[in-house]
């Protein structure tokens, strides 16, 4: 039995390719292996930006937290518990102004929690605690950012890989859908390439 967490974040709704392919992967894995699938749609239910109550509350002993801190920390704990319970995480991210959406950034701000999802080991080096999980990261962009002149402007893929790794999620497979704004034929080819990659993932996943 496999527990799957699907996190989508694109505000494009039904037009979102990152949401489409992330959902296909999550549902395909569930169909193959069984288990539970939990979906967290950050666009439909955006997490709040972090506040002073959260920043102070997360390092305050539970019994000493103010009501505002209790409320702020409770949401972060809910997000963290969902990640901890998952064996597989499928994350969909559509590029917004060269980076991930603010909704997804807010989610990472909540789960990046000192003493809970990361700590510090020898020589003060950070060590993530959310280890032993597989992550499928689906990124979408209208242009081509994996190579060429626009590659230096991709502040989405590397950023998300770093944030995942910081909390211990280092087994990350990236699925890109890009180059969809260069006309119908280019979009068709880009989508077909991603469809083939998704099929391969579902056929070979262990």
From Swiss-Prot:
Record-given protein name: FMN-dependent NADH:quinone oxidoreductase
Keyword NAD recorded: yes
Cofactor: FMN
Gene that this sequence comes from: azoR
Protein family per UniProt: Belongs to the azoreductase type 1 family.
Recorded catalytic activity of this chain's protein: 2 a quinone + NADH + H(+) = 2 a 1,4-benzosemiquinone + NAD(+); N,N-dimethyl-1,4-phenylenediamine + anthranilate + 2 NAD(+) = 2-(4-dimethylaminophenyl)diazenylbenzoate + 2 NADH + 2 H(+)
Enzyme Commission number: 1.6.5.-, 1.7.1.17
InterPro entries attached to this UniProt entry: Flavodoxin_fold (IPR003680), Flavoprotein-like_sf (IPR029039), FMN-dep_NADH:Q_OxRdtase_AzoR1 (IPR050104), NADH:quinone_OxRdtase_FMN_depd (IPR023048)
PANTHER family in the cross-refs: FMN-DEPENDENT NADH-AZOREDUCTASE 1, FMN-DEPENDENT NADH:QUINONE OXIDOREDUCTASE
Biological source species: Azorhizobium caulinodans (strain ATCC 43989 / DSM 5975 / JCM 20966 / LMG 6465 / NBRC 14845 / NCIMB 13405 / ORS 571)
